[in-house]
Amino acid sequence: LPASSAASDVYKRQLLHFLTSSVNKKDMDAQLLNLWRCAYALTKRGARYDYPEKYWLGGTPLNETFVSLHQIIPQFKKRNNVQKVQCVVLTDGEASGIPVVTEFKNHDGEVRRGTSNVGYNSFLRNRKTGHVYNLSGHYEYWKFAETMLRDLKESFPDVNFIGIRITDRREFGSFLRMFHATEDEIKKARKNASFSIKNSGYDSYFAILDSSLAVD
């Protein structure tokens, strides 16, 4: 894109709001049914239902969700007139580094704009709080999410952040090793189909095997 293009034209994300407790039972049932139909159409070939084209699944927008929470949390507190909030993040995957807008010169010397991942020699600055975070140690891709959580916790000290990571049996062990779980702990966690992670960016973080869930 030309350098004159807006950064928002280069990189966009939309966080979708599927369900809400502010509706009556009839509308809630309709919301749940439509969500089930979308999920069924995405996972079953030859399904009678089709899904909206813009709902096609891509990567895990976890870091983008953390960015959105800086707006969602104040809006939620104001709308519901609450002071303390429990924020639960449910995900079935990790996120890679968040893309940023960069400028470069093409072979004609024209300045262009594109995207690239945040470099290891970069810093993250919260313009509102003034907090600055060094990203130099983020050679492990999941560490970026921990920095995003740290910024959220410093921005909203009255919010309790709880993470729930759904994982299949194949990746369960490797996921726990990311947080330095021992082999004995992993063996016990497989038996219990869950594990409480103590050294993450969340106030509480739980890994749950998908085989332990009631799946229809």
List PLM regions with ranges:
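C-terminal helix of von Willebrand factor
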Residues: D184-D216
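Charge-dense, low-complexity intrinsically disordered segments
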Residues: L1, W56, Y139
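VWA/integrin I-like adhesion module and closely mimicked acidic/polar interface patches used
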Residues: S68, K78, E94-E185, N192, ...
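Structural motif
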Residues: K84-V88
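Von Willebrand factor
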Residues: D9-V82, K143
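Active-site flanking residues adjacent to catalytic metal/cofactor-binding acidic residues
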Residues: T91
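Single conserved hydrophobic/aromatic residue that forms the stacking wall/gate
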Residues: L1-A7, Y11
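Generic detector of low-complexity/intrinsically disordered segments
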Residues: A3, H17-S21, S211
